[in-house]
Structures are given as C-alpha cells and as structure tokens.
Amino acid sequence: MDDAAVLRKKGYIVGINLGKGSYAKVKSAYSERLKFNVAVKIIDRKKTPTDFVERFLPREMDILATVNHRSIIKTYEIFETSDGRIYIVMELGVQGDLLEFIKCRGALHEDVARKMFRQLSSAVKYCHDLDVVHRDLKCENLLLDKDFNIKLSDFGFSKRCLRDGSGRIVLSKTFCGSAAYAAPEVLQGIPYQPKVYDIWSLGVILYIMVCGSMPYDDSDIKKMLRIQKEHRVDFPRSKNLTGECKDLIYRILQPDVNRRLHIDEILSHSWLQPPKPKAMSSASFKREGEGKYRADCKLDTRPGSRPEHRPDHKLATKPQQRMLVTPENEDRMEDRLAETSRAKDHHISGAEVEKAST
C-alpha cells in the first residue's frame, strides 16, 4: 500500500511534496478530523541506517510526543505500518522556513528579528528546562505559521541530557548538526555541553536574521574554525545594527564555552526586552540598506525585496547538510578535509572534525 493509501485510511488526504531529507520525506495533507492541513513526515525503517533507527529515531519520537510549546511545531499523531513505515503528523508551517523567507526578503528589521528570536529563545529555554537539547538549530528548521511566528521543528538529532551522580550534565560525544551552525568545540571533536552547543547555533541564526548573510564562510572548515576561535565577528556596516544587537550576537558566538551566554542570560539581555513605548509618526521609517518598513513592522513577503547590499557570505542555495560523527566510528576518521571543503554544500565527516581540531 502506498503512502497516499495508508494516509487515506487514517483520514488524511495527501497533498504536495514539501521536502525530502537524508532519511525522510515530508508531504502536506488535509486532516478530515482536524479540518485543516498538516505536514506528514514519512520514514522508512528499511531504507534508514541502523544507527539512526536504533538511536536517533526513538529519541525524536519520544521528544515530539512530550514537548508542548507555542513556538514548537505541534505533533498530532505518530503511527507505523507493519512494513516499517513511520508517519509523524505535525503542524504545517504554511509560510515556509526562515531561510527561504530571508533569502526572499533580505535581512530583517531589528524589531522583527527581536520578536522572532525571542520566540525561538523561549522554545529553546523550554527544551533546556526539560533537559532536552536540539543539536540542529538552523534557519531551515525554523518554520513560519500564517502570522510569521517561529515554530521550531526537526528534532532528529535531539536527545535528553544525561546527568552524573553529582547532577552535572554528561558531555556529549556525538558530533552532529550542520557545519555552518556548529560550535567550535563540535567542529574540533571535543566532548561538549549539548545545551551550550545549542546556544552557539542561536547566535548564528540571529546574525543571519539581522544581516541576511552567514557570519562565517563554511566552504573552508579549518579557516572558519580559526576565525571562530579568535572570536572574530564582522558585521556589515550597511546594516546599521544597534550596539545592543551586536553585543548579544558577539557574546553568544563566544568560543570559550565557559563564557558563552546561557539561555536565561540571552532572554534577559537588554536587546530582547520589549521596546519602551515612544511617539512614532504614521509614516514609514527607513534604515539604510534595508528598504522601507511600515511603522508597525509588518513583514513584506513579496519576492524580490532583497536589501541593496549583497551579503558577505551568501546564504546557502541548498539546505545545509547534516554532519554526524558518533563515538563508534571516531576511530575510523581519515584525513579528507581538503577535498570535502571544496564542496559548496558538503557533509561534515569524522575526517573534518579530526583535521579541523589540529
């Protein structure tokens, strides 16, 4: 029985294909029970690596069934067929993902970015308070609802933190995520605090929101890592970012894990606080290189409204591929950094983690 027939029996009328990842495909569908459209993630156990099926998939399904937050994609139903196909029925991000939005729209005005980033940070705090880490925070995994609110999705690399006898979180040794959003310690293959890793990814996302470009060029992992370890963050002058915004990004993209901000410190940062009421004319206001915005900061989603200035590091035209190095295969790392770094949208292997750390 094909996917459409399986879903039809469950009360879902299949629509269009929304995307395809390494181990799954996503389709839209209309739920006769819920009376609205949903997204259905379909995973075939037979076509999925054993390590993913045995370790990551159970974690993802467990966490999806647990989390409940307004800025996290809702999961309505999970079921499996006798032949090993898993169907995860979720909330549909009707406005697409944040990456596509920014590629179309350009850098966001700080007021808009503040609202979205506060929503994302709130979702991450909710997860961290439950000792759940995402480990693949990136713009492609941030979906937008009809009102352009952030919805965190794709918990494929998520896990529940383990604690030792003293209550301290056990360091993670599975180096996963997407290279452009990965923290320096992860790229170096150093056992890491998973919550602190999530924080770094938040900094990359915020930079993309307000600059419309990547903070680092990930076409050369070794060079990128060197710049990150020097705590260099360059901001385009054309964006005229406020000092508070740049301060928050700079403090999040801190290579020293002991000095990197925690999620509560991010949420209490001055830039994220609601702006004080002030008189404002009804006329649109303008910021150099950003175009015109309505006084109430509504988002203009029309294609072609890119900012005047081109980004220093262009946003990827393809989704960022994930990296995954598990403890079991660390001893089989080979030196392939030079050849893989030449690929524009490459998969980070164990070799890259090992070489980047030297």
Curated annotation (Swiss-Prot):
Name recorded for this polypeptide? Testis-specific serine/threonine-protein kinase 2
Q: Which PANTHER family match?
A: MAP/MICROTUBULE AFFINITY-REGULATING KINASE (PTHR24346), TESTIS-SPECIFIC SERINE_THREONINE-PROTEIN KINASE 1 (PTHR24346:SF102)
Co-factor(s) = Mg(2+)
Q: What is the lineage of its organism?
A: Eukaryota, Metazoa, Chordata, Craniata, Vertebrata
Q: Which gene encodes it?
A: Tssk2
What positions does UniProt annotate as the active site of this protein? D136 (proton acceptor)
- In this chain, the stretch annotated as Disordered covers 296-358
**Record keywords, A-Z:** ATP-binding, Cytoplasm, Cytoplasmic vesicle, Cytoskeleton, Developmental protein, Differentiation, Kinase, Magnesium, Metal-binding, Nucleotide-binding, Phosphoprotein, Serine/threonine-protein kinase, Spermatogenesis, Transferase, Ubl conjugation
Which InterPro entries does this entry report, sorted A to Z?
A: Kinase-like_dom_sf (IPR011009), Prot_kinase_dom (IPR000719), Protein_kinase_ATP_BS (IPR017441), Ser/Thr_kinase_AS (IPR008271)
The segment(s) forming the Protein kinase domain are 12-272
Residues binding ATP, per UniProt? L18, G19, K20, G21, S22, Y23, A24, K25, V26, K41
Localization (cell): Cytoplasm; Cytoplasm, Cytoskeleton, Microtubule organizing center, Centrosome, Centriole; Cytoplasmic vesicle, Secretory vesicle, Acrosome
Q: In which domain of life is the source organism classified?
A: Eukaryota
Q: Which family does it belong to?
A: Belongs to the protein kinase superfamily. CAMK Ser/Thr protein kinase family.
Disruption phenotype annotation: Male mice lacking Tssk1b and Tssk2 are sterile due to haploinsufficiency. chimeras show failure to form elongated spermatids, apoptosis of spermatocytes and spermatids, and the appearance of numerous round cells in the epididymal lumen. Elongating spermatids possess a collapsed mitochondrial sheath.
